[in-house]
């Protein structure tokens, strides 16, 4: 009986009145998050019942946080996705169709090691396992297609070379070097494999057993799941008056739902902490707020993106009726288990991660990736 009671206590928290509350109905907060939420509560006109845990932890009731966040969305505190970010009739897409397309374009679309993404303001990015091989855009002065690449992928890795990097001085007098992107059409024409090799050399540790990078895993998932994934690296500002940016790793389509999926490696420190709340909980909360406030706008955006990709002959998930696509406001978390050996500490880490994610009602799954 004592063991069962102890196990049960792991799923209960005590409020300031001494009452026991299920941890599924509460949200744990850092001191900074608590202060921020108190400010939001004042703006929204909602009283926040901030509670103090036995070990000094701060928490609030989930329904109070949900109300505050929803009220702030209504008040346009959450940045809204503006319309017109994509134009299916844009000159770039017209110039990449049929005989008008540069000779290097079609081979890129058929290269199974590459994946091609449509970006806001009608820019196209070409990726090779974590490296952005090329940025393709329309040049209105020449009325043509331009393709540029980071100089390091073209072999120019010396950041002090003023032909390829722009020097500036940042805070504290620290030197900064900004790459000057270079035309890479000749490389795309006849030196694609060399370009890939340069990227592999720069990311030599990308595929390295348990230390395989998140970007490599992401690229592998996309290139092997073209019937599921529609987009990657979606980014947008979170608040209109703040610099914080929402960045969600992958966007997929399942059962006519557009689903936003965050990717983490099992060893990522943001998944677990024994001193306060893991960062992943705050991250997922922000995703929820953003998706809830923008679900209709995101659906409209991705319907256009889907049609652009399909018209360009790029792989897209099968959809019977594009107009019926809807956005799932609940983000998903995919954890790549790169552990090759099981140890007691690793098993405990996984158990602790799952317990925290489950108690926070996060939709997650853990897949082996070795």
Regions found by a protein language model. Give the residues of each.
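Charged, terminal alpha-helix-loop-beta segments
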Residues: 1-370
């Amino acid at each position: 009986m004592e063991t069962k009671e102890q196990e049960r206590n792991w799923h209960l928290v005590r409020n300031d009145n001494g009452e026991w509350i299920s941890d599924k109905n509460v949200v744990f907060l850092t001191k900074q998050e608590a202060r921020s939420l108190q400010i939001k509560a004042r703006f929204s006109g909602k009283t926040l019942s901030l509670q103090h845990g036995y070990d000094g932890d701060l928490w609030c009731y989930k329904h109070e946080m949900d109300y505050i966040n929803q009220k702030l969305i209504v008040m346009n505190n959450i940045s809204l996705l503006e319309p017109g970010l994509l134009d299916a009739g844009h000159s770039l897409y017209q110039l990449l169709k049929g005989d008008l397309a540069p000779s290097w374009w079609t081979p890129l679309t058929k290269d199974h090691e590459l994946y091609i993404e449509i970006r806001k303001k009608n820019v196209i990015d070409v990726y090779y396992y974590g490296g952005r091989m090329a940025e393709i855009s329309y040049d209105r002065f020449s009325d043509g297609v331009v393709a540029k690449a980071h100089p390091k992928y073209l072999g120019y890795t010396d950041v002090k070379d003023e032909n390829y990097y722009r020097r500036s001085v940042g805070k504290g007098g620290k030197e900064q070097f900004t790459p000057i992107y270079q035309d890479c059409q000749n490389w795309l024409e006849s030196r694609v494999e060399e370009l890939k090799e340069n990227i592999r050399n720069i990311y030599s540790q990308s595929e390295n057993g348990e230390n395989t990078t998140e970007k490599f895993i992401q690229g592998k998932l996309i290139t092997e799941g073209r019937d599921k994934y529609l987009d990657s690296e979606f980014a947008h500002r979170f608040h209109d008056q703040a610099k914080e940016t929402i960045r969600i790793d992958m966007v997929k389509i399942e059962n006519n739902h557009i689903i936003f999926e965050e990717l983490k490696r099992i060893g990522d420190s943001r998944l677990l902490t024994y001193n306060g709340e893991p960062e992943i909980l705050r991250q997922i909360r922000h995703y929820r707020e953003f998706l809830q406030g923008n679900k209709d706008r995101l659906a409209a955006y991705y319907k256009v993106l889907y049609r652009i990709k399909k018209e360009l002959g790029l792989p897209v998930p099968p959809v019977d009726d594009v107009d019926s696509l809807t956005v799932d406001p609940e983000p998903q978390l995919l954890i790549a288990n790169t552990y090759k050996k099981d140890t007691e500490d690793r098993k405990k880490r996984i158990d602790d991660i799952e317990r925290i994610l489950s108690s926070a009602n996060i939709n997650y799954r853990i897949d082996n990736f070795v």
